[in-house]
């Protein structure tokens, strides 16, 4: 009789500092077989899981539930109660009927009434599925693995790339560990080394930065049969929760000593590089003044308002400074403003409107009044260039106001590539200046053809100026929030052997 393996998931990255709560309606929810059906052919964790499981030859894949949303503010009470209930209820028919479970999670989820959603789901899943059933889950490199998660799971497969491109590979690693447990009887022992550091900046790019050295080392260990999974999480500095930190997580086949050895090596090397892992931010006024004198194209990285990190997407800070100083070049600017979209749709294509843009959601931004022509409108639904998601921005319009072209969305979406522009008939290469609301994108999207990428010190709920955010929940002292932080490596061991 074939082994039945269950697949389920719940994932969202959150910025605690985004004042707008997420709701249930922000999530794409799938039930039953459609969880797998929707993932097939995509670079997704579930697709990676399925590929490995299908290669076993003696596995029946079943799926129960998946809920995923664009990064945003914390999930509100009602939304969390519904998603957690649906997730757990979906597992109950499989109690006593499966050989193992794989969960696709994020690690930086947070809710109005629950600071460790993934930990809660794993704890309750264990109660439903039983203590003997192996459970392995995936997490983002920006996830915040907690003691509760590790206590109730057998292992975790963490992304090895930033910017993220190894979604399917991470799912595959989770599935391989699960099959080794079921088929070969390996005994997972997890070693975690928390590091009191929150980091940002170009040195975190795994292909080129210092952080990539630690990730490459841990990735190389997967050739060793003693290693079931090994990864490094830098947390999400914008998810202010009790166990927020950077951390190494190594899962071995019952070899605690080896797990300690490799985890400590990676952790200590990372700590030694901490002062290099920060963003070199350019003051807003200087950024605009510098770009105004350049031939272009110029990329303005507005990571402080990156929806992919949990921001609201309605910052107008860079454009406001451009308007104030009479910026002479063409500008392509994405922004979330549902009320402006409504006005534009009512007016129709080629209509002239006067609207206030920005600050509709996050009140730290002051709306700016613009007179604009409605160029186009769309339903805001499109696939990203490399990520495995379909974005749903809601009704979307393009507005032209003098030298400014605004792509105005009804809802925040991932702005990690050029797809939001292409989907609305715009090519970023046709503009002198492009505002990119993401900390980092694949080089081909902007960096490779722009004269300069200016990482702007703008306000926002995902600012790389971490001291500006106001953490109140995470453990302290924490680098760089506090001075003279010491790191005394203390490995924590979790085992269900």
Model-found features: residue ranges?
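Hard-cation-handling environments
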Residues: 202-402, 407, 411
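Glycine-rich phosphate/diphosphate-binding loops that line cofactor/substrate pockets in enzymes
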Residues: 1-2, 54-58, 63, 89-101, ...
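Charged, often glycine-rich, active-site loop that binds/positions anionic groups
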Residues: 65-86
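Extended hydrophobic packing segments that form well-structured cores
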Residues: 63, 85, 271, 382-497
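Active-site histidine-anchored catalytic micro-motif
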Residues: 6, 11-13, 27-28, 77-84, ...
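Cap/lid and interdomain-hinge subdomains that line or gate substrate/regulatory clefts
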Residues: 60-62, 71, 109, 136, ...
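Short acidic, glycine/serine/threonine-rich loops at helix termini
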Residues: 17-21, 73-76, 113-115, 146-151, ...
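N-terminal amphipathic/basic leader segments beginning at the initiator methionine
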Residues: 2-55
């Amino acid at each position: 009789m074939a082994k039945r393996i269950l697949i389920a998931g719940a994932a969202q990255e959150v910025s605690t500092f985004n004042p707008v709560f997420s709701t249930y309606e922000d999530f794409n929810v799938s039930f039953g077989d459609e969880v797998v059906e929707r993932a097939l052919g995509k670079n997704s964790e579930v697709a990676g899981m399925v590929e490995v499981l299908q290669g076993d030859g003696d596995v029946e894949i079943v799926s129960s539930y998946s809920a995923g949303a664009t990064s945003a503010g914390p999930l509100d009470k009602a939304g969390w109660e519904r998603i957690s209930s649906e997730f757990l209820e979906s597992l109950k028919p499989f109690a006593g009927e499966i050989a193992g479970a794989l969960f696709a999670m994020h690690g930086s989820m947070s809710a109005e009434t629950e600071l460790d959603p993934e930990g809660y789901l794993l704890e309750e899943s264990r109660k439903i599925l039983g203590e003997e059933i192996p459970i392995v889950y995936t997490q983002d490199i920006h996830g915040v693995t907690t003691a509760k998660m590790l206590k109730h799971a057998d292992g975790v497969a963490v992304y090895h790339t930033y910017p993220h491109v190894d979604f399917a590979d991470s799912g595959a690693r989770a599935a391989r560990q699960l099959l080794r447990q079921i088929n070969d009887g390996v005994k997972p022992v997890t070693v975690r080394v928390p590091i009191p550091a929150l980091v940002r900046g170009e040195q975190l790019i795994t292909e080129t930065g210092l952080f990539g050295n630690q990730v490459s080392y841990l990735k190389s260990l997967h050739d060793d049969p003693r290693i079931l999974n090994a990864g490094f999480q830098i947390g999400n500095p914008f998810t202010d929760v009790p166990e927020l930190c950077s951390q190494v997580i190594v899962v071995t086949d019952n070899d605690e000593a080896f797990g300690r050895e490799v985890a400590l090596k990676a952790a200590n090397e990372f700590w030694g590089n901490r002062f290099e892992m920060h963003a070199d931010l350019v003051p807003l006024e200087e950024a605009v003044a510098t770009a105004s004198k350049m031939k272009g194209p110029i990329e303005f990285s507005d990571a402080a308002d990156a929806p992919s990190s949990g921001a609201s997407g309605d910052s107008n800070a860079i454009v406001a400074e451009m308007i104030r100083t009479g910026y002479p070049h063409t500008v392509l600017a994405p922004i979330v403003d549902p009320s402006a979209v409504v006005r534009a749709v009512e007016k129709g294509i080629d209509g002239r409107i006067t609207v206030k843009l920005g600050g509709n959601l996050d009140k730290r931004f002051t709306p700016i009044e613009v007179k604009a022509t409605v160029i186009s409108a769309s339903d805001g639904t499109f696939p990203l260039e490399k990520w495995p998601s379909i974005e749903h921005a809601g009704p979307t319009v393009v507005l032209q106001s003098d030298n400014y072209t605004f792509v105005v969305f009804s809802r925040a979406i991932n702005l990690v590539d050029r797809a939001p522009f292409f989907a609305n008939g715009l090519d970023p290469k046709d503009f002198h200046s492009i505002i990119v609301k993401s900390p980092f994108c694949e080089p081909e999207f902007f960096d490779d053809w722009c004269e300069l990428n200016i990482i702007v010190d703008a306000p926002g709920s995902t600012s790389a100026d971490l001291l500006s955010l106001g953490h109140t929940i995470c453990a302290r002292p924490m680098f760089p929030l506090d001075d003279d932080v010491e790191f005394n490596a203390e490995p924590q061991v979790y085992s269900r052997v």
